[in-house]
Design a protein with these regions (language model features):
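Short, well-structured beta-strand-loop connectors
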Residues: 139-143
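Short, basic/aromatic beta-hairpin or loop at an interaction surface
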Residues: 64-74, 112-127
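Short, compositionally biased
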Residues: 106-118, 155-158
């Protein structure tokens, strides 16, 4: 099991950028005070959007001016590589919040306001959505424990 860390907690009433907060309450529908602009994004499977700070740094190296929250993620994390974790992975936060990775995030047209090329360049590094399994308070800097999903062998493999 690997450990990650919360670098930034980001919210906005809708749209981007999202603004960093030192701590925030997390409910089943997502982060308190955070809004989603599109009805299709208001689902429990997309309650929280998570992005790796390392992916933002990669994109900065390609000429994009990005900081945590710029691409609309709620949580900017370090040492997780959420884009490569399987769906169903559990993230246990030190203060008790538990999330489950539920859906790969696809680039959206709102990224055009940053740069029209970003939507293409961020494919496969846009982060992941998660559903909330256990509500609580997130605090910037807290650690995250990763629990990979158990994969049982199929009948043909027994």
């Amino acid at each position: 099991m690997s450990k990650g860390q919360v670098i930034s907690i980001n919210v906005s009433p809708g749209g981007i950028p999202k603004i960093s907060q030192p701590m925030i309450r997390v409910g089943i529908e997502g982060l308190e005070g955070d809004g989603h602009n599109h009805e299709k994004q208001r689902t429990p499977l997309q309650a929280v959007c998570i992005q790796d700070v390392e992916k933002l740094e990669e994109l900065k190296g390609e000429g994009y001016s990005l900081v945590p929250g710029t691409t609309g993620e709620n949580l900017t994390v370090q040492n997780l590589n959420v884009n490569n974790l399987p769906l169903g992975t559990i993230l246990r936060f030190a203060n008790g919040v538990v999330l489950e990775l539920s859906k790969v995030r696809k680039p959206c047209y709102v990224l055009d306001s940053i740069n029209p090329r970003l939507k293409e360049d961020i494919v496969n590094r846009c982060g992941t959505y998660a559903k909330v399994l256990c509500e609580g308070v997130l605090i910037q800097g807290e650690s995250i424990q990763v629990v990979l999903p158990v994969v049982l062998p199929s009948e043909g493999e027994l």
